Structure formats: structure tokens, C-alpha cells
Swiss-Prot record:
Entry keyword set: Glycoprotein, Hydrolase, Protease, Secreted, Signal, Thiol protease
UniProt family annotation: Belongs to the peptidase C1 family.
Protein name, as recorded: Gamete and mating-type specific protein A
One Gene Ontology biological process: proteolysis involved in protein catabolic process
Glycan attachment sites: N55, N98, N119
Function: Thiol protease that seems to be involved in the sexual development.
Leader peptide range in chain numbering: 1-19
GO molecular function: cysteine-type endopeptidase activity; cysteine-type peptidase activity
Gene name linked to the record: gmsA
Active-site feature positions: C262, H397, N415
Keyword Transmembrane helix appears in the UniProt entry: no
EC number(s) recorded for this UniProt protein: 3.4.22.-
Region of interest (Disordered), residue spans: 171-242
Length: 448
């Protein structure tokens, strides 16, 4: 079994700089695991969960696998003997072992003891926590490596655990209540479980139910985004009645790193591309909005968000540029809505109805943020038109829809996992079905 922590990520082949856990880091990992098993978050175990034994053989095999920097899980996981997770931080200097382990611990609150699996409505991964407290696992090993552009840490547990439908340990009570209520608005931030969700009908509510946060009034007038002195020619109408491709109006592919900020990246990418469509592509390589500004200002930050909240929050104050509030891939405490330097402004935002026809009609005007469900097959996408073998009804990730090809009936999306993923950071998805639950919720777009 295998799952990637917080974000579903692929890692390209790179040359290793150095690797290995320090004695202090190993002790931190051991201490966390001892605490998780001796005092588990959740119902009291019927019997004490035995402490895991550090297995040097597992650790060495895992180290050898990680040092390849190819993003693949070890053969122990591939053969199904071990449960395994990986977490990476980019750039290297952002590596934070305690934050990684804290994120795993947070997953305990999202385990549904009645359903015997992660709370499907919470859209927060809890499976890594079940690996760590699986009562039948007896030993484990962990490893760390530093590649040129990222740091990776991984743990592998023997024998494998974390199976959906099986409790990680036997509680004293037989039917405990779920530890966390399901939120009313999806938070597409965390890795998808490998087990498909039940095929229940998609919600019929026309827009997300969580109210958008109140926009703070700036204390001083914020400078507006400078517009080109002469408007650029508009894009020629597509030759087909439905086919459209806005790829040539995209800023470079970004990488959200070890932070559940896909919602911010998709929303800022929509702003950037729609600006270029209206005013020309002179700033195509330089226009970059601050995703950190969004992560700092909107509730939950690296733990999730929604495009509607993003566009509503920054409609009045505007959003900072990357150079003024650079991305750190962590939830900060300083929400900046005013400054002496220019902020990027837009007029308003809207959303589409939950139909293919409505989505394609809006796509003719420019890219639209869409929510999708990501599973292991999605994360391993390389090229071609992806067709999910499983029909999902929930979502856990936000991307930017940039095109549609009528001949192949396929969408084209821009992701935020770096240019080494998929087709240089992009992906094509069949539009012949809604297996990824695109129409479970409304899709959003900004206007100028």
C-alpha cells in the first residue's frame, strides 16, 4: 500500500545531493510513533497497541529507494508487504520534519470509526495515520534524502496495514461516533484514498454552502494593476463550435509544494490567464501573483480552500504580486490587504452551473477553475487522455480548465505540481463522463 502525504505528487528523476536521517531526526520520528501508539487519538484501544520496533533493514532498503530521487515507492510497497508514505518539501530549505509528522497526526481527527475509513466529506487524508497506529504492524523504518530541488522523507511499515473497512485497532466501544463532523464546503487539499468512494448522487445545491469571508476594507487606497496603454487584439474565435485552447495564454506552471494550496494556485492562474487574454501576452513570462497572500488570508490556508472564497476575498483589496509576498508553502499569520506597492485588481467573479454545456460556454471566454477527485491513477498520469476507471462523487483537488477538444471530447487542465508532472504540467481528461466529479460543485472564474 502507498500514499503520498498532503499532496498527490510525482517526483522526476534527479541526481541525489545527500541523504540520511540524522540521529536527532530518527529520534523525533520514534517519539512521534511511540506517542501515537501509546496514546492514540480516538477511542481507547481494548488492549494496548504494541510499540513499533525500528527495523534497520527496512530503513536501509527505503534509503536506497529514496536516493534514486525518481518518485517511486520502494519494492516493499510495490509488492504489498509494507504500507508506505512519502512526503517532500520544495525547495530543500523548507524541509520541516515536525510539520510532516504533525500533518499525519492531524489525520486522526478525520477517521470515521463507523465507516471504518477516512471521512469522505472532510476531504482530508487520514490513511497515513492508520499506517502508523495499525495494531498488527510490528516494525518500521524511515529514511530521508535531499535531491537538488526538494527534500523527501518516507516511512515504511511491516506488515502492511491501513486497509479501508478494517479498524486500525479494536476500540473498547464497538460503535464510536466519528471524531470530526463533515464540513459543508469541500476542501480539495489532501491525497485521495486509493479505495473508490460510494457512488452516491452529486449534490444538487447550485453553489457551495459555506459563506464567503467578509472582505476587509483597506485602510489606504490600493494602487490598481497597471493596464497596457493600448488594448491587445482579442483571441480569434475557435474554428470549431466547441473546441478552444487557452494554453498560449498561460503563465509558467507553478509547484504548490508541501502545502494544500491547490485552490490558491488554480485561482491565481485563472486571474493571470484571463488578464493576458484581455490585455495581451506581453507579461506572460513575468506576471505572477502571490499564492502566499491567499494562503495567509483565507481560512485553513495549507489545509484547504475554495475558489469562490478566494475571488470574493480579494475582489476589493486586490491580491499581492509574488515579488511582494513570496511563496513559502506554509500557512502564515500575516494577512496583507494593503501596501504601498501595486496590487493586482480584477472586477468581479462568477460561477457556472453544474453542466458540461455551461462549463464549455464559459470556457469560450477564458479558463475556469474546476474541482476534481484525484486518486493514485491520476497522480501517476504521464500522457494521453485520462479516463478514470472509477466514478467518484466527491472532490479533493482544484485545477484550471484551459481547453476542450471537440474531436476527442477531452478537457485540458493546468495543474500545480510542477512541469515535470503529466504533459509538462498539463493533463487531458475525457469529457465523455464525469467520473472525476467535476460537476459535483460549481466552477469559478474571475472577470475584468
Amino acid at each position: 500500500m502507498k500514499l503520498i502525504l498532503v499532496l498527490l505528487c510525482l517526483i522526476s528523476t534527479l541526481f541525489v545531493v545527500k541523504g540520511g536521517l540524522s540521529p536527532t531526526e530518527q529520534q523525533i520520528i520514534v517519539s512521534y510513533h511511540n506517542k501515537w501508539r501509546s496514546s492514540p487519538i480516538g477511542p481507547t484501544p481494548s488492549t494496548t497497541i504494541p510499540a513499533l520496533k525500528w527495523n534497520a533493514t527496512i530503513a536501509a532498503a527505503l534509503q536506497s529507494s529514496l536516493d534514486k530521487c525518481d518518485g517511486k515507492f520502494s519494492t516493499m510497497s510495490q509488492y504489498g508487504t509494507n504500507s508506505e508514505w512519502q512526503s517532500w518539501w520544495t525547495p530543500n530549505t523548507y524541509f520541516n520534519l515536525n510539520a510532516t509528522l504533525d500533518n499525519i497526526q492531524k489525520g486522526a481527527s478525520f477517521y470515521d470509526w463507523n465507516a471504518k475509513g477516512c471521512n469522505s466529506s472532510a476531504n482530508y487524508n487520514c490513511q497515513l495515520w492508520t499506517y502508523a497506529v495499525w495494531s498488527k504492524s510490528t516494525s518500521y523504518g524511515c529514511a530521508k534524502t535531499i535531491c537538488p530541488d526538494k527534500s523527501e522523507v518516507s516511512c515504511s511499515y511491516y506488515p502492511a496495514g491501513g486497509f479501508k473497512g478494517v479498524l486500525p485497532y479494536t476500540p473498547k466501544t464497538t460503535t464510536p461516533a466519528p471524531t470530526t463532523p463533515a464540513p459543508t464546503t469541500p476542501k480539495p487539499t489532501t491525497p485521495a484514498p486509493t479505495t473508490p468512494k460510494p457512488t452516491t448522487p452529486a449534490p444538487t445545491t447550485p453553489k457551495p454552502t459555506t459563506p464567503a469571508p467578509t472582505t476587509p476594507k483597506p485602510t489606504t487606497p490600493a494602487p490598481t494593476t497597471p493596464k497596457p496603454t493600448t488594448p491587445a487584439p482579442t483571441t480569434p474565435a475557435p474554428t470549431s463550435t466547441l473546441t478552444v485552447d487557452w494554453t498560449s495564454y498561460q503563465t509558467p506552471i507553478r509547484d504548490q509544494g508541501q502545502c494544500g494550496s491547490c485552490w490558491a494556485f488554480a485561482s491565481s492562474a485563472a486571474l493571470e490567464s484571463r488578464y493576458l487574454i484581455k490585455y495581451g501576452t506581453a507579461q506572460k513570462s513575468t506576471l505572477q501573483l502571490s499564492n502566499q497572500n491567499a494562503v495567509n488570508c483565507i481560512a485553513s490556508g495549507c489545509n484547504g480552500g475554495w475558489s469562490g472564497n478566494y475571488f470574493n476575498f480579494f475582489k476589493t483589496p486586490g491580491i499581492a504580486y509574488e515579488k511582494d509576498d513570496p511563496y513559502k508553502a506554509v500557512t502564515g499569520t500575516s494577512c496583507i490587504t494593503t501596501s504601498s506597492v501595486a496590487r493586482f485588481k480584477y472586477t468581479n467573479y462568477g460561477y457556472t452551473e453544474k453542466t458540461k454545456a455551461a462549463l464549455l460556454a464559459e470556457l469560450k471566454k477564458g479558463p475556469v477553475t474546476i474541482a476534481v477527485y484525484v486518486d493514485s491513477a491520476f497522480q501517476n498520469y504521464k500522457s494521453g487522455i485520462y479516463n478514470s476507471a472509477t466514478k467518484y462523487t466527491g472532490i479533493n483537488h482544484l485545477v484550471l480548465l484551459v481547453g476542450y477538444d471537440q474531436a476527442t471530447d477531452a478537457y485540458k487542465i493546468k495543474n500545480s505540481w510542477g512541469s515535470w508532472w503529466g504533459e509538462s504540467g498539463y493533463m487531458r481528461i475525457t469529457a465523455s463522463n464525469d467520473n472525476l466529479a467535476i460537476f459535483a460543485y460549481n466552477s469559478y472564474y474571475p472577470t475584468f
